[in-house]
Amino acid sequence: MSSTSLSVTKLSTESLPHFLKFFDGGAFSDNPKWSSCYCQCFYENHDVVKWSECTAERNRSMACNRAQAEEMQGYIALEGQEPVGWCGAAPRHLLHALDDEPTPNAEAVGAIVCFLVAPHRRGEGIARVLLEAACDGLRAQGMTIAEANPRPDAKTAADNHFGPLSLYLSSGFTVHREDADGSVYVRHSL
């Protein structure tokens, strides 16, 4: 990775075309069954919306609407003008899929819920750069805690869609608690 040509931009109306190019393109070439998500899963209240019935077209439209209304947040890694990575990170109160998992001081918690790096660019440190940008962005919004839910036993890139546990631990996150499904919650003070 050339550090001089890699940049990270926050999702916005202006950067939305980069997000769409990445998600419409080869981002999921090694995991096509998830290509319909457009990082909308955590924005939905699953008591209201049946996620399994949400189509790619619907999710793409919702991503556009939410990005334009500043109700969806995340960071896009660009190599020049080519999108090569994505990190979904937002204040917890925007992520309605987490509504049934209350946490103390939720208004101060930013959740990192998605990592996606172009398959041909994995292992180059792009996720680390995205994680730093996500933490900086959450801090700038007044969040005092960054939280994520990685899978310790991840065997594939798809299993690491919340980000690799090793990435978080090497970036100053610590295990906050274990979940019944074998995953862990990690946190970092911002």
Positions of PLM-derived features:
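Conserved acyl-donor/pantetheine-binding loop and adjacent beta-alpha core of acyl/acetyltransferases
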Residues: 53, 65, 69-72, 78, ...
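Conserved beta-strand edge residues that scaffold enzyme active sites
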Residues: 81, 152-153, 182
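Conserved acetyl-CoA-binding loop-helix of GNAT-fold acetyltransferases
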Residues: 112-117, 123-140, 170
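Active-site rim helix/loop that mediates acceptor-substrate recognition in acyltransferases
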Residues: 37-73
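C-terminal "cap" of GNAT-fold acetyltransferases
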Residues: 160-172, 176-190
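Conserved N-terminal entry element of GNAT/NAT acetyltransferase domains
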Residues: 1-46
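Conserved GNAT acetyl-CoA-binding A-motif
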Residues: 131, 138-158
